[in-house]
């Protein structure tokens, strides 16, 4: 199902008439802190995070595009079982290291399977990137195949940056 979803996103992305305006980007996200303020379990013993925050170092690059900064992520909806299966919806603010007024603000929808995470992320640019949008996928390397969890919380990002579409044109 996930593969079909990503194939459909790719087809829509690359067959769009605005394809020439899109810049393919890639990069990395490394979590630097994770704080849970309040959580509870439901009748199925799944964990719900009412308030959790993650900070990360972000690097996104391509020919003609670059962004390096920090991410502040609020986990707005998190439902996880004891096997690492679940769903997380986040609100994100990415701030540039060189200019705090340059930001990307957006959200992500993530699926977890046995602790391995796949997300689709959408952002709107501010400051230097005013009028731009960014759409990314976030894929965690499968560390769930081994018993020892030595994942450094380093995630690969891939996607596009493009002009924000204008409705009615």
Describe these PLM feature segments.
Residues 4-14:
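Sec-dependent N-terminal signal peptides
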Residues 16-20:
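Sec/Tat signal peptide C-region and signal peptidase I cleavage site
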Residues 21-169:
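Beta-strand-enriched cores of mature, soluble protein domains
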